[in-house]
């Protein structure tokens, strides 16, 4: 599949069609990408560019329920994105700075959002509190100039590997691993979920997967078939 999925350029950030995430033996394809920004005094200010990558088997896994849905239907579906976030396949998220940011600013904002949601649903336990402490510790002394990236490898077993790149490369190993499924899922959901920080990335993922899923009737037979149908979808797009 990796060869037939196109890359995405967002400003000065290029998201290639496929990457091998830190700590992973798999090559993941680019599910979608978009910016995180905010309206400030009438201007849309872009803070980060975000790319979301998925393991090949995400397509047959999602096709069972979502094939034939339009990009608009998928964009509006809370359940669809929950299946991406919680699905039994690897995910990789690259957050690249457009404006400079400190590690403390980033980790505290992510942590606040996660804890608020967990407390709302009554799922915040000591395990999550310890995971948040470790998450904040990873970023404590970091600074991220424009072009630097924070990298999240999300394993189906619930582990979250955090990597840091200051030169645009993707390292083979990460800086830390946090064994907490809820945190791992929440990091991705905070980006492409219904209330996520990048509606543009959410729409991009929905649009690209809608095209792949259209051709997924014969994708469930294995990776070779997935690759074939992906090429067909790309040719039609």
Swiss-Prot record:
EC number(s) per entry: 5.5.1.6
InterPro entries named in the record: CFI, Chalcone_isomerase, Chalcone_isomerase_3-sand, Chalcone_isomerase_bundle_sf, Chalcone_isomerase_sf
Any one GO molecular function term: chalcone isomerase activity
Site (Important for catalytic activity): 106
Name by which UniProt lists this protein: Chalcone--flavanone isomerase 2
Family of the protein in this entry: Belongs to the chalcone isomerase family.
Transmembrane spans: none
Catalytic reaction equation(s): a chalcone = a flavanone
Other observations noted: Part of the biosynthetic pathway for all classes of flavonoids, a large class of secondary plant metabolites, many of which are brightly colored.
Free-text function comment from the UniProt entry: Catalyzes the intramolecular cyclization of bicyclic chalcones into tricyclic (S)-flavanones. Responsible for the isomerization of 4,2',4',6'-tetrahydroxychalcone (also termed chalcone) into naringenin.
GO biological process: one example: flavonoid biosynthetic process
Binding site for substrate: 48, 113, 190
Record keywords: Flavonoid biosynthesis, Isomerase
Class of enzymatic activity (EC top level): isomerase
Pathway noted in the entry: Secondary metabolite biosynthesis; flavonoid biosynthesis
């Amino acid at each position: 599949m990796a060869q037939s999925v196109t890359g995405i350029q967002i400003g000065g950030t290029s998201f290639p069609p496929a990457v091998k995430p830190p700590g992973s033996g798999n090559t993941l394809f680019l599910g979608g990408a978009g910016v995180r920004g905010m309206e400030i005094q009438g201007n849309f200010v872009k803070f980060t560019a975000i790319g979301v990558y998925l393991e090949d088997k995400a397509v047959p896994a999602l096709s069972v329920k979502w094939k034939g849905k339009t990009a608009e239907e998928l964009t509006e579906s809370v359940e669809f994105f929950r299946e991406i976030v919680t699905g039994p396949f690897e995910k990789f998220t690259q957050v690249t700075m457009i404006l400079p940011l400190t590690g403390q600013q980033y980790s505290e904002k992510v942590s606040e959002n996660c804890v608020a949601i967990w407390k709302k649903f009554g799922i915040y336990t000591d395990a999550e509190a310890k995971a948040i402490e470790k998450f904040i510790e990873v970023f404590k002394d970091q600074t991220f100039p424009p072009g630097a990236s924070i990298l999240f490898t999300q394993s189906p077993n619930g582990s979250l590997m955090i990597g840091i790149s200051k030169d645009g490369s993707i390292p083979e190993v990460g800086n830390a691993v946090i064994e907490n499924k809820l945190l791992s899922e929440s990091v991705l959901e905070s980006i492409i979920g219904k209330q996520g920080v990048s509606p543009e990335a959410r729409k991009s993922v929905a649009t690209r997967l809608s095209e792949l899923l259209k051709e997924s009737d014969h994708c469930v037979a294995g990776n070779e078939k997935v690759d074939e149908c992906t090429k067909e979808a790309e040719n039609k797009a």
